[in-house]
Amino acid sequence: YYTGGCVAGAKALPIDGAEWQAMRLSRNRYWGTPKLVETIEQLAREGRALDGWPGLLVGDLGQPRGGPTPSDHISHQSGLDVDIWFDPMPDRRLSEEERETISATSLLVPGTNYELDMDKWPEGLDRVLKRAAGYPQVQRILVNPGVKKLLCDRAGDDRAWLSKIRPWYKHDDHFHMRLRCPKGGKTCRSQNPPPAGDGCGVGLDYWFSEVPWK
C-alpha cells in the first residue's frame, strides 16, 4: 500500500531532462516504479509542448527500495507517489546547491490555510493539473483546498477530471500525484477510487467551514 510497503525493480528518474529537473538530490528519493518515472517524463514533455508549462521541478518520489522515509512522508513507500512543485522550471539548469536550498513557493496568503495569493499563481498550472488528472494511470492528485476550489471555479463544462483532484492538508507549494497499482501487481493494493462527481460540492465545503480540520 502507499503508506506501508516497498518496491522491487525501482527505476531512477534522471535528475535532468529537457523538460524537468529533480530537486533535493541528497535525499536519494528520485526512485519509483518504471510507470511512475514514465508518467513524470510524459507530463513534463506534454506540459511544455501542449500547455505552455516551462517544465517540472520534481520533488520526492521514493527511496531505491521504497519503504518509510526518515522525514516528511507517510506515503511514498511503494514507488507510486511523486511530489511536483507548483513552481515552473526556470530556463537554466539549477546547481546542486540551489536544488538543496531553494524552497517551493507557497501559493497561499501568509498565515492562511487556503486563501490563494493570485499574484503567485503560475500561468499554465491549471492546464498541467488537468493533463495529469486525465492520465488513466493516475489514481488521484492531492492539492491544497484553495487550489481545488480555484480549479472548480475555472473548469467550465469539462469537469470529469476534477474528481481526481483531491483537497488535502498543506500541499500549498506542490501537488502530490499518485498512480494506480500496476497491472498484474498482485502484492499492491490500490486506494479506493475518488467519489463520483467533480468533488466541488459538500465535500469541498468542509474545508472552508468552521469545523476544525481532522
Named regions from a protein language model:
Residues 63-117:
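Acidic/His-rich structured neighborhood in mature extracellular/periplasmic domains
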Residues 1-9, 67, 79, 106-108, ...:
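Glycine-centered flexibility motif
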Residues 56-62, 82-86, 143, 175-179, ...:
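Long, contiguous hydrophobic alpha-helical segments, chiefly transmembrane helices and signal peptides
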